[in-house]
């Protein structure tokens, strides 16, 4: 059988504010895992989600594994 590429892949989203802020009280930035369809969204995913470290809704960017 031929190998087929999966259209759905698991990605990691990281808080934009926590990752850029080096003076944060928390050593790690907030992260979410989710899935995206490679055919529908070939570019990097950007979502607005709640950050438990910042205590507000912030922008989350897709990062490399």
UniProtKB/Swiss-Prot annotation:
Keywords in alphabetical order, please: Chloroplast, Plastid, Ribonucleoprotein, Ribosomal protein
Q: Which domain of life is it from?
A: Eukaryota
Record bears the keyword Transcription regulation:
no
Where does the record say this protein resides? Plastid, Chloroplast
One biological process term from GO is: translation
Q: Name one GO molecular function term.
A: structural constituent of ribosome
GO cellular component annotations, sorted alphabetically? chloroplast; ribonucleoprotein complex; ribosome
Coarse class of the primary localization is plastid
Classification via InterPro entries: Ribosomal_bL33 (IPR001705), Ribosomal_bL33_CS (IPR018264), Ribosomal_bL33_sf (IPR038584), Ribosomal_zn-bd (IPR011332)
Q: Which family does it belong to?
A: Belongs to the bacterial ribosomal protein bL33 family.
Checking NCBIfam families in the record gives: PRK00504.1 (NF001764), PRK00595.1 (NF001860), rpmG_bact (TIGR01023)
Protein name as catalogued: Large ribosomal subunit protein bL33c
């Amino acid at each position: 059988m031929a190998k087929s590429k999966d259209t759905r892949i698991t990605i990691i989203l990281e808080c934009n504010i926590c990752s850029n802020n080096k003076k944060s009280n928390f050593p790690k930035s907030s992260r979410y895992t989710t899935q995206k369809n490679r055919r529908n969204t070939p570019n990097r995913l950007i979502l607005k989600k709640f950050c438990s470290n910042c205590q507000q809704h912030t922008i989350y960017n897709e990062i490399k594994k």
